[in-house]
Amino acid sequence: HESYLNALLDYIIADFRRFRKEQADDSIGAMIVCKTNPQAREMYRLWQERFGFAQHIEKEWNGQLSMVAAPMAAYGHAKPLRASLILHDEGDKLERKAYIEEYKKQQTVDVLIVNQMLLTGFDAPRLKKLYLGRSLDGHDLLQALTRVNRPYKDFKYGYVVDFVDIKE
């Protein structure tokens, strides 16, 4: 539901900005794990609405949303956060790889929005905040948690915000 996603996005944006400020490090990245691919697409659409379309890199796949948006900052406002949508059924393997590399190496993307992609085998040490909007258990949960626990600068561990009440 759009009102739920808007409230969730409000929280995530405020929390992530506060986290970066507290850590005094704008290179820190985050990942939002959505419940479904349609929810991830909607979250990404709402993200784009928040930060505008003044300047963006747009790739169209059968009329789907663009994968990376880079809006320009307005005078007197915080620098816009950039998001990338990475889904297994969006684009082809080479395109997804290019967006992942942009996140890892160029650090021009602040937040990755995913459903199932990148929860295992994804090594980006700057990823320090994980927002779980989908229930995970067992091996999948362990793999997701290890995404934020890579050594990076002075960080020894990452942080998880649990929106689905994972107990243990």
PLM segments and residue spans:
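Conserved RecA-like P-loop NTPase helicase motor core
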Residues: 75-168
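Conserved C-terminal RecA-like helicase domain
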Residues: 1-114
